[in-house]
Amino acid sequence: MIAIAVGVASLALRDPVAGRLEREAMRLAALLESARTEARSAGLVVRWRPVPADDRGTPAGFRFEGLPPQLKLPQRWLASEVRAEVIGRPVLLLGPEAMIPAQRVLLRLGAEQLLLGTDGLAPFAVVPETAP
């Protein structure tokens, strides 16, 4: 009985790093979809790229390229230790076409990582790392 209670309790305790990374992934998915919608509606070529931290102390972040200046989307992670890597290319292409290439971005925070992706038609979402 005690073993079952301990097992259930350990499953209920989430790793705080995993939770932070999951929040970053959900936030990034929403930002990517917002930029994708703007790209389609305005006929703009919009790209997203991760920006590494630099030697001057600027934290890692990301940049949307091609959006109108009045549309100010965030450029920093909520957790400054987050790192991102676009898989197979330097940037994500978010428009102007409704059907974009299948794309993925790997997010890392400490030892945790999550893969965010789209098949080109569906919205960006967390996908299993074993998915093609």
What are these regions (language model features)?
Residues 4-41, 45, 50-132:
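N-terminal helix-rich module
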